[in-house]
C-alpha cells in the first residue's frame, strides 16, 4: 500500500490546484483501477478507455475505505459524474472519460470538476472532495444505525415470544396442581364451560336438560367417577382448546 500511496502522490505532485495538477479523486481512482491485485473487483475495460466495477459490495467494503475513507458507492458515483465521467453500459457499472485511459496518466490533469455557474474559488476542489467524503461517511453511519434499530426490534420480538413460550408450562402445572387438589371444582368448571358453549350454539338449552345435569351430580354438586364417565360418554369429551379457572389450554 505504501507503493500505491507514492504513485498517487506522484500523480498529484505537479501542483496544488495549479496548472498540470491532478485532482486527488482522479489520481486515487486511476491508481485503484490500474492496480492488478484488485482486478477481481475493479479493472480496465478491454480497450483501456473504460473501467468496470465488477463487485460493488467488495468495492464499497474494502477499496473505498482504503482510498476515500468511506464506504458509500453512491457517493463515489456522484463524484465521477462531477468530473465528467459517464456510465457507458446501463446493465453494469462501467464508466468512461476521454482523458481517463489505461497507461495515460499524463492526461489526468485534463479531468476537472464541472464548473457551477459563477465559477469556483481556487482551492475549492479539494474542499469539495473532502465534503463528499464526509457526506459519504455520514450516510454510512445513518445506514448502520437503521440496521442496528432493525436488529433491536427483532431481538425484542424474539424475547417476547420466548417469554410467552416459557409461561405456558407454568400455566399447565398450575392447572394440574389445581386438578389434583380440587378435582370437583375443576370438573364443575369444565362442565359449566361446556354448558356455556352449548347454550351459545343453540341460543339457549332445554331447562329439563339442565335439571338432569344437576340431578346427576353427587353430594356437594361433585360428580362421582362413574357419573362423570357416564356424563362424558353421553355428552362427548370436553372440547379443546378449553378454558378453566381463567386459563386457556391447547
Curated annotation (Swiss-Prot):
Domain of life, source organism: Eukaryota
UniProt region (Disordered), positions on chain: 199-226
PTM text: Exhibits temperature-dependent phosphorylation.
SUPFAM superfamilies documented for this protein: Winged helix' DNA-binding domain (SSF46785)
MF-aspect GO terms: DNA-binding transcription factor activity; sequence-specific DNA binding
Residue span of motif Nuclear localization signal: 209-212
Gene Ontology CC terms: nucleus
UniProt note: domains: The hydrophobic-rich region (HR-A/B) corresponds to the oligomerization domain.
Protein name in UniProt: Heat stress transcription factor C-1b
Natural source organism: Oryza sativa subsp. japonica (Rice)
